[in-house]
Amino acid sequence: MADLEEQLSDEEKVRIAAKFIIHAPPGEFNEVFNDVRLLLNNDNLLREGAAHAFAQYNLDQFTPVKIEGYEDQVLITEHGDVGNGKFLDPKNRICFKFDHLRKEATDPRPYEAENAIESWRTSVETALRAYVKEHYPNGVCTVYGKKIDGQQTIIACIESHQFQAKNFWNGRWRSEWKFTITPSTTQVVGILKIQVHYYEDGNVQLVSHKDIQDSLTVSNEVQTAKEFIKIVEAAENEYQTAISENYQTMSDTTFKALRRQLPVTRTKIDWNKILSYKIGKEMQNA
């Protein structure tokens, strides 16, 4: 073990540490970070070499953050990254600094929005917030309006989590939806992600995702937003139902097949007659 440690360069150690951090289960970033910190035993090397991993984790996980002085949380995503460690809150038209290690937002400042698409963005956001409030008690959503390859594009992100460390499980839902504002019809592209970690009597993770494509009729802002939410709701309901049904199937068939219902003798022990069995006599004599 000592020989292996001597063979690893600082660069290799940081690369391994960064992988652990990026793949930390939802709600367990601090635990993984502290374990990696002990293993590496070099805080400066960890902070400097693995800083990109802290950022990547928050971007991948759609980490929600509360900005002081503002009511609603905003998601940390690649779509809101405006550079230099700053992120966009499109609803409040501000940008802010974000500390990826402490997960804190500071220094909020006004930020000019894409005026040409803002009315579309606002309509979608209003409809999406109502949907999230109804379906995700702990949900947070952020809607962006951007010009991508010359096309006005709406990007909607949803995050909802339950962290139950006392009960040995944590889980997070993420979904991302995109469509361009084009006459008549457009294509909606979505990706749905679920990640759950259970670790009381073992170490089990569910990591699942599903890609979605559908067509959307584009009319005015409000009506288009309503039709968009119908697509989101149908797809997310179907996905969650399928996950639940698969788990029920595994519980009824797959997991039961992993163990015998009866011992090798194909006979259940009658505990009331245990003393008449040879093992009972041996236990009594012991």
Curated annotation (Swiss-Prot):
Chain positions with N-acetylalanine modification: A2
Described function = F-actin-capping proteins bind in a Ca(2+)-independent manner to the fast growing ends of actin filaments (barbed end) thereby blocking the exchange of subunits at these ends. Unlike other capping proteins (such as gelsolin and severin), these proteins do not sever actin filaments.
**SUPFAM superfamilies given in the database record:** Subunits of heterodimeric actin filament capping protein Capz
Q: What organism does the record attribute this protein to?
A: Artibeus jamaicensis (Jamaican fruit-eating bat)
The domain of life is: Eukaryota
Name of the encoding gene: CAPZA2
Complexes and interactors: Component of the F-actin capping complex, composed of a heterodimer of an alpha and a beta subunit. Component of the WASH complex, composed of F-actin-capping protein subunit alpha (CAPZA1, CAPZA2 or CAPZA3), F-actin-capping protein subunit beta (CAPZB), WASHC1, WASHC2, WASHC3, WASHC4 and WASHC5. Interacts with RCSD1/CAPZIP. Directly interacts with CRACD; this interaction decreases binding to actin.
Q: Name one GO biological process term.
A: actin cytoskeleton organization
GO molecular function terms noted in the UniProt entry: actin filament binding
Residues modified as Phosphoserine? S9
Swiss-Prot/TrEMBL keywords: Acetylation, Actin capping, Actin-binding, Phosphoprotein
Q: PANTHER family in the record, alphabetically? A: F-ACTIN-CAPPING PROTEIN SUBUNIT ALPHA, F-ACTIN-CAPPING PROTEIN SUBUNIT ALPHA-2
Official protein name in the record:
F-actin-capping protein subunit alpha-2
* UniProt cross-references to InterPro entries, sorted A to Z: CapZ_alpha (IPR002189), CapZ_alpha/beta (IPR037282), CapZ_alpha/beta_2 (IPR042276), CapZ_alpha_1 (IPR042489), F-actin_cap_asu_CS (IPR017865)
Instruction: Give me the Gene Ontology terms describing cellular component.
Output: cortical cytoskeleton; F-actin capping protein complex
Family from the record: Belongs to the F-actin-capping protein alpha subunit family.
